[in-house]
């Protein structure tokens, strides 16, 4: 699996994730504005955090 791993609006970068079957994109807001985090897997998130998990290479941009 290959997933994007750049933060928020940074230029796209990817990471190879051996053994993973998901990529994720988490989104939340704080005093800095909207924060976006991308990576491998499908982590559980706390209330107020939106997450989108997907199962194809580079699907989480």
UniProtKB/Swiss-Prot annotation:
Mind naming one GO cellular-component term on file for this protein?
A: extracellular region
Q: Which UniProt keywords apply?
A: Acetylcholine receptor inhibiting toxin, Disulfide bond, Ion channel impairing toxin, Neurotoxin, Postsynaptic neurotoxin, Secreted, Toxin
- Tell me the PROSITE patterns matching this sequence: SNAKE_TOXIN (PS00272)
From the UniProt entry, list the residue stretches annotated as the region Disordered: 1-20
Report the function annotation for this chain. Binds to muscle nicotinic acetylcholine receptor (nAChR) and inhibit acetylcholine from binding to the receptor, thereby impairing neuromuscular transmission.
- Stored InterPro entries: Snake_3FTx, Snake_toxin-like_sf, Snake_toxin_con_site, Toxin_cobra-type
Organism the protein comes from: Naja melanoleuca (Forest cobra)
| Highest taxon, organism lineage | Eukaryota
- What's a single GO MF annotation on this record? ion channel regulator activity
Q: Write out the tissue specificity statement of the associated record.
A: Expressed by the venom gland.
Q: Does the keyword Secreted apply?
A: yes
UniProt lists the family membership as follows: Belongs to the three-finger toxin family. Short-chain subfamily. Type I alpha-neurotoxin sub-subfamily.
The family database entries (Pfam families) matched by this protein are listed as: Toxin_cobra-type
- List all disulphide bridges recorded for this chain: 3-23, 17-40, 42-53, 54-59
Protein name, per record:
Short neurotoxin 1
Where would you find this protein in the cell?
A: Secreted
- The residue ranges flagged as biased composition, category Polar residues, are 1-16
